[in-house]
Each structure stands twice: as structure tokens, then as C-alpha cells.
């Protein structure tokens, strides 16, 4: 395997939370936003947008932290067998950690774009996507000689946040509907603290256990075990910090 395979493997791994969270949010949010906007219910649209922001962040940020902190055990469990050597797993994990930084941005795009689509504006997001694509290509080509194959992953991550920046700036014209408010910012801060707490716990756990994972079977079992530990740690910190509860997620993902 070479650079293309490494990037492909990392892409498959971070696409899992992106697909589950991003698509679910988009499917639920767009019809609800459209309904409120058509009815002239600005407050309802604002609440729907705020709720989608909180839920998407609550699901994507801990996933990004985990992919950044413990990418190698996750990659090893999935890919380190057959023709994929340890050096390949390390390279895939490196790309995965870079992509993890952009994961919240990719999911935020799924939250922000429905604001435009609900107003029947598809041209503006398309124009922003073109700008982000130019940034992506420019960085990938410009950094290739300096950084090698990881330039592609870095370019993808940077361009994802550039796209979010364009969408946030453009959404100002939607007024209060596109704002999360002080309460929303406090909730996002508590979610971030819970995710960082989870990340610290996973880092410590992996530091103690990694040297004992020396067989294929243990590698396969170790990755899912860390995922389960991360879920439990995040749930604990989220509960202690009053960040978000399963009931909050259920209400947010339920169509009204």
C-alpha cells in the first residue's frame, strides 16, 4: 500500500461518523427549517437550528477527539492484517488524525447548508464550495513538495473549515434565525469540556495498555474496547458537566 491507500483508509474511517451524524442532522433539520420558514415562524427556525448545532457538536466533537487521540488502535483493529503492515497502519493513523481536525467542520456544513436550502438558495452554498475547492487544490499542490502525501489530508481539513467560514459569514443575512445565543454557546463549551475529558481518559488508558497489544486478535478487540471506553467516559463527563443527555439527542433527532 502507498499514499493513495493510506488516504483512502483514513477517509473511510472518518466518513463513518460524518455519514451517520451529518446525514441524520440534514434529513431532520431541512424539513423542519423549511416548515418554520414557510410558516413565518422565525423563533421555531431559530430553535431548530440551535438544536441541530448542539446535537451535531455533541456527536461529532468527541468522535473527532477520539480519532485525533487514539487513531492507531482504531486503524490497527480495522486494517492491520493481510497486506497492510504496521508502517501502513501508522501512516493511515497519521492521516486520520489530520482528518479528525476537520470532522466537526464537515458536519457543521450539514447543519449550515439547510439554512440556505430552506430559503431556496442553492447558488450561494455552491459558490462557497467552489471557493473551498480552489483552496483545497491550491494547498494540496503547493504543499506537496514540502510535506509529501499528507499535504492532501491537510488541504482537505483546511478547506473544510474555510467552507464553514464562508457559510457562517453568509448566514448573517438570516438574522436571529442563524444564531445560537449565549445559552447555546455555554452548552457547546460544556460539550467540548466533556469531549476533552474523554480524550484525556483515552490517552491515559492507551498509554498503559498499548504495549500489551501484541497479537492480531488483541488488536482487533482493542479498538472496539477503546471505543466503548470512550463512549462511557464521554457519557460520564457529559452527565457531570450537564452537557447533553440521551433524552436531548432523542428529542433533537425527532421530527416535530
Predicted regions span which residues?
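Membrane-embedded alpha-helical bundles of multi-pass transporters/translocases
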Residues: 1-256
Amino acid at each position: 500500500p502507498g499514499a493513495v491507500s493510506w488516504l483512502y483508509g483514513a477517509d473511510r474511517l472518518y466518513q463513518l461518523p460524518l455519514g451517520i451524524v451529518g446525514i441524520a442532522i440534514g434529513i431532520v433539520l431541512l424539513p423542519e427549517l423549511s416548515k418554520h420558514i414557510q410558516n413565518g415562524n422565525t423563533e421555531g427556525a431559530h430553535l431548530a437550528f440551535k438544536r441541530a448545532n448542539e446535537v451535531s457538536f455533541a456527536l461529532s466533537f468527541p468522535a473527532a477527539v477520539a480519532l485525533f487521540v487514539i487513531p492507531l488502535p482504531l486503524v490497527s483493529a480495522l486494517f492491520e492484517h493481510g497486506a497492510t503492515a504496521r508502517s501502513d497502519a501508522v501512516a493511515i493513523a497519521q492521516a486520520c488524525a489530520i482528518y479528525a481536525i476537520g470532522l466537526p467542520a464537515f458536519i457543521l456544513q450539514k447543519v449550515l447548508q439547510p439554512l440556505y436550502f430552506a430559503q431556496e438558495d442553492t447558488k450561494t452554498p455552491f459558490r462557497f464550495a467552489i471557493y473551498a475547492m480552489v483552496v483545497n487544490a491550491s494547498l494540496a499542490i503547493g504543499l506537496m513538495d514540502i510535506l509529501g502525501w499528507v499535504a492532501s489530508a491537510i488541504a482537505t481539513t483546511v478547506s473544510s473549515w474555510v467552507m464553514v467560514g464562508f457559510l457562517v459569514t453568509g448566514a448573517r443575512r438570516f438574522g436571529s434565525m442563524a444564531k445560537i445565543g449565549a445559552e447555546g454557546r455555554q452548552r457547546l463549551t460544556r460539550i467540548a469540556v466533556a469531549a476533552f475529558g474523554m480524550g484525556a481518559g483515552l490517552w491515559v488508558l492507551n498509554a498503559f495498555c498499548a504495549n500489551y497489544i501484541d497479537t492480531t486478535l488483541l488488536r482487533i478487540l482493542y479498538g472496539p474496547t477503546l471505543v466503548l471506553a470512550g463512549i462511557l467516559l464521554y457519557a460520564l463527563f457529559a452527565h457531570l458537566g450537564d452537557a447533553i443527555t440521551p433524552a436531548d439527542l432523542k428529542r433533537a433527532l425527532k421530527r416535530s
